[in-house]
Structures are given as structure tokens and as C-alpha cells.
């Protein structure tokens, strides 16, 4: 089942490319609102707060109260959960970056030069001022690049994150669709037992990290425990002064979907108070 992750610049006709691919291949298109809803549901945060954070609109105080690593893990888990369903296209929120190591996922970036984008936006919104269109495009680009930098520390314009980069100023929408459809049909992007295993291993790791966050808070992964997943088997390493936490973590992770076994190599370090 085809899985496509697409990133598109504003006013590049990327939505037309996405619609054309979905129609040709019978794919569901997953928009960012669905990802936001799922993250809000898992974290207990209001959807409006999740949206503001992902759009780069949160205030400085709000950003202090939001753990970047935890939000990036929640985003990663939602994207991986969606990809595991198959037969869909995921647009935005770092899906192309998060899924680029999955062999059967086609990661696409749609872009175009600024003059082309200005013209598209002016026609779409009925604008007569090119400068106004440019400002809106630049604001949108900055917000999206800021989100990728904040969550994953990457430049979304880096072509190495994608299977294919298409410039719609030079390549018509219909030809973009054809190029991407051909990639999904190529043996290089065929789903195999190995590629499915790679996806599931990353998904189980994301589920495990989420479970640890929910049960013990971010300190479990930031200060003490490290989590590794190999073919569904979880290995805990690290050190902690909390011996009960080790036993609790093993029991917790045994119940995580996709986990087939848990081994702990976490060292218990006795707490020795400093002498006065």
C-alpha cells in the first residue's frame, strides 16, 4: 500500500498535485488538522494550543512551558501511526523528514521560485499588490521553517530530506503527478517485509517513549533511562537511584502495543547523602 509524505511551499499548486496523486492512486489525504487533533488527544492539550505551537505562534512563555523534545516525539508518533495504516498521503508537519528512512515511503517536496508563487497567490486571492503576496508567502515560509527547526532541528528546504523535489514553475501539475505515481510503482519504493519492519520498529519506539513520558514524566528519558527497540524487543539501559522505577518501567512497557519483550540493563545506583 502506497505511503507518500509531502511538503509543499505555499502557492506552488502543491495542493493540486496532492489531489491528483490521491485520485490516481486512491489515497486518503491526511491534513495537519488530523495530526493536531491526535496530538491534543494524547497529550491532553487543547487543540488550539497544539496548533499555535506547531505554527510557531506560541508566546515566549508558552514555549517555555512546552517541552520541545516531548512535542517532537508526540508528532513523530502520530505520523508513524498514520504511516502504518498505509494507502495514504500525509501533508506537512515534518512527515517527509520523519519517514525518510522508511524504504517504501515516497517523500516529496513541491516548490517554486518566488515570482511564480506571487502570481499564483495573487490569482487565488484576487490581489493586485505583489508585495503583499510576497509578505504573506514569506511569513508562511518562516513559520513552517521555524516549526521544523524547533521540533526537529532541520532545514525543511534541504533536498536530502526528500525522495524527489519538484519545481512547479517548470514542471506542470499533471507531470508532477505522473512522476510521483511512477515512484510509488517503482521496485525501489515497494513495500517489503524489511521496510515494514523498519517502520514498525520506529513506531514501537515512539509508543514506548510516549508511555514512559506519560507514566514517569520527561525525566525518565532525559535523566537515567535510555530506550532501544530491536524487532519489537525493548532494551532499557542507563542508571537511576529509584529501584522501584526500574520494575515499574518493565511492567509498563510489557503492555505497550507491538512490544514482544522487555529487558532491563538499568543500573541501580545507591543514593549516598553528602555529609554535613
Where are these regions (language model features)?
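N-terminal targeting leaders
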Residues: 101, 112-113, 119-124, 140-141, ...
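RNA pseudouridine synthases
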Residues: 82, 88-116, 120-122
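Long, charge-dense
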Residues: 28, 35-52, 113-122, 126-143
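Short, ordered loop/turn segments at secondary-structure junctions
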Residues: 9, 34-35, 93-95, 112, ...
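ATP-dependent small-molecule kinase phosphotransfer cores
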Residues: 35-87, 127
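Pre-Walker A (Motif I) flank of P-loop NTPase domains
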Residues: 1-4, 8, 232
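Glycine-rich phosphate-binding P-loop
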Residues: 5-19
Amino acid at each position: 500500500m502506497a505511503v507518500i509524505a509531502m511538503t509543499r511551499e505555499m502557492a506552488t499548486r502543491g495542493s493540486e498535485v496532492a489531489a491528483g496523486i490521491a485520485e490516481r492512486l486512491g489515497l486518503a489525504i491526511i491534513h495537519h488538522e488530523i495530526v493536531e487533533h491526535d496530538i491534543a488527544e494524547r497529550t491532553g492539550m487543547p487543540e488550539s494550543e497544539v496548533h499555535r505551537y506547531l505554527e510557531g505562534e506560541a508566546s515566549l512563555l508558552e514555549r517555555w512551558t512546552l517541552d520541545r523534545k516531548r512535542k517532537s516525539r508526540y508528532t513523530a508518533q502520530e505520523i508513524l501511526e498514520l504511516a502504518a495504516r498505509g494507502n495514504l498521503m500525509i501533508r506537512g508537519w515534518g512527515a517527509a523528514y520523519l519517514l525518510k528512512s522508511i524504504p517504501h515511503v515516497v517523500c516529496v517536496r513541491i516548490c517554486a521560485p518566488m515570482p511564480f508563487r506571487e502570481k499564483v497567490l495573487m490569482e487565488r486571492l484576487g490581489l493586485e499588490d505583489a508585495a503583499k503576496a510576497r509578505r504573506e508567502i514569506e511569513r508562511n515560509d518562516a513559520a513552517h521553517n521555524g516549526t521544523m527547526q524547533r521540533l526537529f532541528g532541520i532545514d525543511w528546504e534541504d533536498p536530502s530530506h526528500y525522495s524527489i523535489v519538484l519545481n512547479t514553475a517548470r514542471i506542470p501539475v499533471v507531470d508532477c503527478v505522473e512522476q510521483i505515481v511512477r515512484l510509488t510503482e517503482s521496485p525501489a519504493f515497494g513495500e517489503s517485509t524489511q521496510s515494514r519492519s523498519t517502520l514498525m520498529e520506529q513506531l514501537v519506539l515512539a509508543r514506548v517513549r510516549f508511555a514512559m513520558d506519560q507514566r514517569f514524566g520527561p525525566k525518565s528519558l532525559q535523566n537515567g533511562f535510555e530506550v532501544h527497540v530491536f524487532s519489537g524487543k525493548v532494551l532499557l539501559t542507563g542508571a537511576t537511584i529509584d529501584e522501584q522505577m526500574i520494575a515499574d518501567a518493565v511492567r509498563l512497557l510489557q503492555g505497550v502495543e507491538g512490544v514482544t519483550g522487555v529487558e532491563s540493563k538499568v543500573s541501580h545506583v545507591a543514593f549516598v547523602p553528602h555529609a554535613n
